[in-house]
UniProtKB/Swiss-Prot annotation:
Underlying gene: trmD
EC number, as in UniProt: 2.1.1.228
Coiled-coil ranges from the UniProt annotation: none
SUPFAM superfamilies in the record: alpha/beta knot
Functional description taken from the UniProt entry: Specifically methylates guanosine-37 in various tRNAs.
Primary location: cytoplasm
Database matches in InterPro entries: Alpha/beta_knot_MTases, tRNA_m1G_MeTrfase_C_sf, tRNA_m1G_MeTrfase_TrmD, tRNA_m1G_MTases_N, tRNA_MeTrfase_TRMD/TRM10
Top-rank lineage group of the source organism: Bacteria
Catalytic reactions on record: guanosine(37) in tRNA + S-adenosyl-L-methionine = N(1)-methylguanosine(37) in tRNA + S-adenosyl-L-homocysteine + H(+)
GO biological process: tRNA N1-guanine methylation
Native species: Chromohalobacter salexigens (strain ATCC BAA-138 / DSM 3043 / CIP 106854 / NCIMB 13768 / 1H11)
Name by which UniProt lists this protein: tRNA (guanine-N(1)-)-methyltransferase
């Protein structure tokens, strides 16, 4: 997959192009990431990349005269690579955008070319959004200093779904949210830590039972911690049965806990 990034601080992206899963993907040629810095399109001696907003007020906006050429050049590069326009998308990281979730990540990973625009200052001219941006995306309802970190989140999430990037073919399928659910608990050696033991089922070697346990824990953890993810979700018969079992086990555990709290101390 090819990803183009428009950013005033391309050096920040070395965190994902040189390290970890995405760094290995770049080294192996599975993922290619190129950069366009609007500052390279400045014509004045100060290489100005910001401008005052009409109407006054605090803050500055990214300069149109340097931002648009960077986006246009990234689009042309995608075309030169033979990427179909219908499978090329320019996205802008913005608080006004669609919330990024795993379904959205899958949509973006199906593209041939993804161009990510990382904003700075107070944002970009609305006319640039209308003319040059295909979609706006957000990673959450909070304020950051710029779009580079959200862009890195998007690039990392998308690259994980590129065939061959993850070492194990099922890793992406088993990630949290891959099926709209939280992940199940995981355990490694040793079998006992401070008196806490690995669940017996995981030591049984019964792969069918382990799969069932993991699905139950995934459903239950979602019900406990992110119940909104289950709203409107149609569970199949097995999923509903496992969730009901988990809820019943939780109720039993809580009742036992309350009984223990009320038990008088022995004299």
């Amino acid at each position: 997959m090819w990803i183009g990034v428009v950013s005033l601080f391309p050096e920040m992206f070395e965190a994902i192009t040189r390290y970890g899963v995405t760094g290995r993907a770049v080294d192996q040629g599975l993922l290619e990431v190129d950069f366009w810095n609007p500052r390279d399109y400045a014509t004045d001696k100060h290489r100005t990349v910001d401008d005052r907003p009409y109407g006054g007020g605090p803050g500055m906006l990214m300069k149109v005269a340097t931002l648009r050429p960077a986006i246009a050049e990234a689009r042309r590069d995608a075309e030169r690579r033979g990427c179909a326009p219908a499978r090329t998308r320019v996205v802008y990281l913005s608080p006004q955008g669609r919330r990024l979730d795993q379904r959205g990540v899958r949509e973006l990973a199906d593209l041939e070319a993804l161009i990510v625009v990382a904003g700075r200052y107070e944002g970009i001219d609305e006319r640039v959004v209308e003319a040059d941006i295909d979609e706006e995306w957000s990673i959450g309802d909070y304020v950051l200093s710029g779009g580079e970190l959200p862009a890195m989140v998007m690039v990392d999430a998308v690259s994980r779904l590129v065939p061959g990037v993850l070492g194990h073919g099922d890793s992406a399928l088993e990630d949290s949210f891959s099926e709209g659910l939280l992940d199940c608990p995981h355990y490694t050696r040793p079998e006992t830590i401070d008196g806490r033991q690995v669940p017996d089922i995981l030591l049984s070697g019964n792969h069918a039972a382990i799969r069932r346990w993991r699905l139950k824990q995934s459903l239950g953890r979602t019900w406990l911690r992110r119940p909104e993810l289950l709203e409107g979700r149609a569970l199949d018969r097995e999923q509903q049965r496992l969730l009901d079992e988990f809820i019943a086990e939780q109720a039993t555990s809580q009742n036992v806990g309350r009984t223990e709290e009320r038990r008088p101390l022995e004299e």
